[in-house]
């Protein structure tokens, strides 16, 4: 399988998806036809989200079709060379994909060789479940099971920083709480600016920041770019 799982879409001082474009270009390998899954968009219309994505990827020669705009979305996915899943609200994303019967077709086409690109919620959707999302509002997706294209759980936008005076839990504390009730999980705290690529059977960490792996009853393990999972 070929996957590009990004923690986020925008870095300070850079345009939207600017840091991701070289990574996308490297993994295209001649693929040009993409379907875009815009359902995580809550505060922007799906048409606008699709147009924004298409404009950014046009210089790479990628044509983008919004899955919400086609008559037969399952067929569109089955014939896609690239599946792109945008960030936003993970619950809404999974709910829409499940209701439209898109989860199995996405899994199948990626396993047959299509490239999967997802940022934030799109990275969450590639995991076994969406239980490590940070998102609100919460809508009921009729279960948390997701695509299971990547075998570990990703927590995008990972940071342990707290505003001065804030008394709420750190992100690590929240992850530790999840590991108490679900000790079987392995969770990757993926900071903004970092990503995971899967190619030729290897998953590799990229990006400038330290990533952390959390398991129940164990200390967090720091990982740097180049680590293979």
UniProtKB/Swiss-Prot annotation:
<dbReference type="InterPro" id="IPR005320">
    <property type="entry name" value="Peptidase_S51"/>
</dbReference>
<feature type="active site" description="Charge relay system">
    <location>
        <position position="157"/>
    </location>
</feature>
<keyword id="KW-0224">Dipeptidase</keyword>
<dbReference type="Pfam" id="PF03575">
    <property type="entry name" value="Peptidase_S51"/>
</dbReference>
<protein>
    <recommendedName>
        <fullName>Peptidase E</fullName>
        <ecNumber>3.4.13.21</ecNumber>
    </recommendedName>
</protein>
<feature type="active site" description="Charge relay system">
    <location>
        <position position="120"/>
    </location>
</feature>
<keyword id="KW-0963">Cytoplasm</keyword>
<dbReference type="GO" id="GO:0008236">
    <property type="term" value="F:serine-type peptidase activity"/>
</dbReference>
<comment type="similarity">
    <text>Belongs to the peptidase S51 family.</text>
</comment>
<keyword id="KW-0378">Hydrolase</keyword>
<dbReference type="InterPro" id="IPR023172">
    <property type="entry name" value="Peptidase_S51_dipeptidase-E"/>
</dbReference>
<dbReference type="InterPro" id="IPR029062">
    <property type="entry name" value="Class_I_gatase-like"/>
</dbReference>
<feature type="active site" description="Charge relay system">
    <location>
        <position position="135"/>
    </location>
</feature>
<keyword id="KW-0645">Protease</keyword>
<dbReference type="GO" id="GO:0006508">
    <property type="term" value="P:proteolysis"/>
</dbReference>
<comment type="function">
    <text>Hydrolyzes dipeptides containing N-terminal aspartate residues. May play a role in allowing the cell to use peptide aspartate to spare carbon otherwise required for the synthesis of the aspartate family of amino acids.</text>
</comment>
<keyword id="KW-0720">Serine protease</keyword>
<dbReference type="GO" id="GO:0016805">
    <property type="term" value="F:dipeptidase activity"/>
</dbReference>
<dbReference type="GO" id="GO:0005737">
    <property type="term" value="C:cytoplasm"/>
</dbReference>
<dbReference type="GO" id="GO:0008233">
    <property type="term" value="F:peptidase activity"/>
</dbReference>
